[in-house]
Amino acid sequence: MKRRQFLSRVTGATASVVALAQQRSLARIQAEAAASSGAAIKIDPAPRFEISPHLYMQFMEPLGVTDPSVEAAWDYETDNWRKDFIETTRDLAPGMMRFGGLVSRYYKWREGVGPPSKRPLYRNYVWGGKETHRVGAHEFVDFCGRVGAESLYCVNFVGDGDKRYAKTREGDRTGDAREAADWVSYANDPEHAERKANGASNPLKIQFWQLGNETSYGNACFKKEEAIKTTIDFAKAMRERDRTIKLIGWGDSGWAGDLIDRAGEHIDYVAVHMMGQTPLSSDTVLRGNRYQSDPERAWNELMGLIGPRIERKLLELEDSLAKHQSKHGIAITEGHLSLAPHNSNPILTEWLTGVYHARVMNLYQRHGATVKIATAADFNGTRWTTNALIHQVPGGVSYLLPSGTVMRLFKRHNGTHGVSVESKPSNLDLAASRTGDKIFLHVANMNYSGASEATFAVNGMTVTSGRVVEISSEDPRQQISPLNPTVFAPQEHSLPQAEVLRWRFPARSVSVVELDCRKAS
């Protein structure tokens, strides 16, 4: 070996040793700072579970005259989806799009395929008015493909047992297991003649199907035993047509354990809805416009809802599944903050609700070992403030309400695996994840009036740099509307370089912190 080569290799090896020593020293400094500080975010980077790509899903339902959702999203001039609607939804980046809800009790899928001019109108019994069927299975699947979402359909589950829909003036609007199985064949059989005749030579590839929607709610639908038997009948019939499909059974209202015991082998997920996100106090300011005179009290009420209204239900469901030795994923296919007036309280257009929705999605992600499908809002419409996305009518802009803005931020900046938060400032609500050597922190500052500062440390790793993608507003009552559709656009900041990186989270802010790390040894 030549002397120059020898010196070069020795120098390189020495530099590597020095760099490694510096990394270990810096990791130790960061760990010591975390141990001595009451304001440290300390992460255990060991992967705990894989984060589902469907965790941030959305839910589309034709809502008749109540809120023209699907109809208002279709541009009849171009005979296509509205361009602004597609662009805003693509930016929202839902991993899954569900079509159904209460409308599935009288939805007849075959009426929505074939030439649009020949598709019949149908009455929307729950939400009023009539639907045109201009958006059927082909158009919905096309929409999902254009926005990058997996398709999920609710089948007509014999009208969920509600006999009203078997005897309407328009005839029997319920659907049986054969009808659902025929839908699976139409969608997924590569050689299906009817689908090909309707212009789709390739399968629609609908892999996810929900059996039952709010079947356990009220007294008009199936009782538990009948619902479970019907679930088995549907699952068998549908899987005879395509064994690769994923099926979601209804397990809310304490039904999950018995559903798993009797039908567990036939389904892949257990569905619940996180409804009932209602005020705890009868003297609430979260009713009508009362919050406007005392926004801080409204904030405090919102912060107090998540434990008793959402977390308790989730923990009870997880406990039930564990007792029945179930490995089925949880599918929270609907759920939103429910305030008077029904689904239209203006507070949901204001940043007062941003942190609330961030905490809800953080809760679901922290439970990502079991929660595989989830949302924090309805999806689209023109009037309901429980939506994630609003579109002007008859045309104009589409924009995201605070719930949608938060889901967009967290979905677009997230890791592949959940990791643990060992310590954090008490004012911050966190969910942490990891992809390779990058750590992602979803942070909601629960402090109404003050900023919260934090340092960062990762066990066994050195945090070398990072950035913050942040949504904040000086005005807690900042409202979004067609006049300011980008008011909640996230702002990006680099973390200031230092041995110990730190950030000051503004009051009421929602942020993602991305930490670039290196192994310390």
Annotate each PLM feature.
Residues 503-515:
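Short Pro-Gly-centered flexible turn/kink motifs
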Residues 5-27:
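N-terminal export signals
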Residues 35-284:
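N-terminal catalytic cores of secreted or lumenal carbohydrate-active enzymes
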Residues 224-354:
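Noncatalytic carbohydrate-binding groove/subsite architecture in carbohydrate-active enzymes
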Residues 461-505:
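Acidic, Ser/Thr/Pro-rich beta/coil linker or hinge segments at domain junctions
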Residues 331-408, 414, 418-430:
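Aromatic/acidic polysaccharide-binding cleft in carbohydrate-active enzymes
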Residues 427-462, 468-471, 511-514:
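Carbohydrate-binding surface patches
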